[in-house]
Design a protein with these regions (language model features):
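P-loop NTP-binding catalytic core
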Residues: 1-82
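P-loop NTPase switch/communication element
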Residues: 54-64, 101-152, 198-201
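Walker A (P-loop) ATP-phosphate-binding motif of ABC ATPase nucleotide-binding domains
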Residues: 85
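Hydrophobic anchor at the beta1->P-loop junction of P-loop NTPases
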Residues: 88
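Walker A (P-loop) phosphate-binding loop of P-loop NTPases
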Residues: 93
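Conserved lysine of the Walker
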Residues: 96
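Conserved P-loop NTPase nucleotide-binding/switch module
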Residues: 117, 122-127, 154-248
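NTP-binding/hydrolysis catalytic cores, primarily Walker-type P-loop NTPases
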Residues: 219, 234-283
Length: 283
């Protein structure tokens, strides 16, 4: 019944399903559904449900909760004011969407933000927000609307900032292209265990869209300036743990230059990041 409610098929011929249940909790939540039937699931039917609560907190609320330090909050506010493009990296459940939504809430109210998502999670406290949500194919296998298609549609909606809730496929090619066509200040999230791993992760995703390594690094260097890395500690606390500046070396490769760490404070990339901010703001 859950599979049918998600518009998907689950039977002996199709023994697994991956879908979304909308309208849960009086329409407040979306639930991601994954199920596998035996004999593929050897011990019996395996069902996984993940509740996606709208991310509505602002930076002040995250600071009160201890998820972001005052110093990091000020630096992030400067990044947003300077319209630097940024990616939020981290593992599953580390708080990437929560931080991204809070950061978008700090964008000037006159700016138009167009968010493209695989599932409706981003709900930043911002008055000029347009949300586009992808759709899976129905039981007949038709009607799919991909994130990549929606990124292209977003370009036609006069956005001041384009945001992709989660970059996990070939849509990275279209996002980077969009950010390189005059749409400064864009953002997104990506799965990675550290800021240093983000370029390699984007290489793999770009390959799905037919973009080779050299082209990816060229596009990335021009499109994205900052990485925000979130982590989840052994006590379950989620926090912004690192800020890095993306820079291109003499070989043409993009790497992450550490700028700030939650335990170690300012890093060697801190002053270069401040200089980029000053240059953008004309200071």
């Amino acid at each position: 019944r859950l599979a049918v409610a998600a518009g998907r098929r689950l039977d002996d011929a199709q023994p697994w399903v991956d879908g979304q249940l909308s309208g849960v909790g009086s329409g407040r939540f979306t639930v991601r559904l994954h199920a596998v039937l035996p004999p593929v699931a050897a011990a019996g039917t395996c069902l996984s449900l993940r509740v996606l609560r709208p991310a509505t907190q602002d930076l002040a609320a995250l600071a009160v909760a201890g998820a972001i330090t005052p110093e990091a909050a000020r630096l992030l506010a400067d990044v947003i004011t300077a319209r630097l493009a940024f990616l939020v990296s981290g593992g599953t459940g580390a708080g990437k969407t929560t931080l991204l939504s809070a950061a978008l809430g700090a964008v000037a109210p006159h700016e138009r933000i167009v968010c493209v998502e695989d599932a409706p999670e981003l709900a930043p406290p911002h008055p000029h927000l347009v949300r586009l949500v992808a759709r899976t194919a129905n039981v007949e296998g038709v009607g799919e609307i991909t994130v990549r298609q929606l990124v292209r549609q977003a370009l036609r909606m006069r956005p001041d900032r384009i945001v992709v809730g989660e970059v996990r496929g070939a849509e990275v090619v279209d996002l980077l292209a969009a950010l390189n066509t005059g749409h400064d200040g864009g953002a997104g999230t990506v799965h990675a265990n550290s800021p240093e791993e983000v370029p390699a992760r984007l290489e793999a995703l770009a390959a799905l869209g037919g973009l080779d390594r050299a082209a990816l690094h060229s596009q990335l260097a021009a499109a994205v300036q900052v990485l925000l890395h979130v982590s989840r500690g052994g006590d379950g606390r989620r926090r912004l743990s690192e800020i890095a500046l993306l820079h291109r070396d003499d070989t043409g490769r993009v790497s992450a230059l550490p700028a700030w760490h939650v335990d170690r404070g300012e890093q060697r990339g801190y002053q270069p990041l401040l200089q980029v901010i000053r240059d953008r703001c004309g200071r």
